[in-house]
Amino acid sequence: KNMRYNLFCRQIETDILERKFIIINKYCTLDLHPKAKLVLNAPFIMGYKRIEGSKLESRLLIEENGRMEIKYGSYTVYYGADIQVFKGAHLEIGGDASVNVGLNLICANHISIGRWTGGGRNVTIRDNNGEHHISIRGYKTSIPIVIKEHVWLTENCTIMPGTTIEAGAIISARSVVQGHVPSFS
């Protein structure tokens, strides 16, 4: 599986000699549209397991013209993750970090996650509301999210559409965040 995705998959841009590759652990499902792109400028470890024998599945979906990019350093996603990049959306991850069990990352527009930004268990980041339309003038179903460098997203926090989290912030457990979070708060 790893050999096929790293050497023969046109949707994934890799260069093994320059440490730009994907490691897909057991019980991971990848669904990449023929016009999707996964750009790796560093190692991307999908579905990392600490408990030997666990069958908790991790999923990665990138739809038509969707783009996911690991920009700088190694990025590890633990098991139980659900990452979805919808049609025409762009997900940028800085790298040099990891996200624990149960990541739920849904990108319909644009999500940018800075370098050295990690997360605890069951973190949810979504830039959309599931295409539920509300009849309010100017209402948008998806708004970009920006999470800057050195941010820590703790257990069970949810980052909502339109959020900007400045560098060095710590988002506390079970928080629902929408709007602007200042640096080092």
Please name every model-derived segment.
Residues 136-161, 185:
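C-terminal segments of enzyme domains that contribute to small-molecule binding surfaces
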Residues 53-57, 131-136:
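Short, flexible, glycine-rich and Lys/Arg-enriched loop motifs at helix boundaries
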Residues 178-184:
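Gly/Pro- and small hydrophobic-enriched strand-loop and loop-to-helix capping segments
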Residues 127, 133, 179:
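Glycine/Thr-rich phosphate-binding loops of Rossmann-like dinucleotide-binding domains
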Residues 1-126, 148-150, 157-159, 167, ...:
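Domain-scale signature associated with acetyltransferase and cell-envelope carbohydrate enzymes
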Residues 170:
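Short-chain dehydrogenase/reductase
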Residues 163, 175:
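Short beta-to-alpha loop/turn elements within the nucleotide-binding domains of ABC transporters
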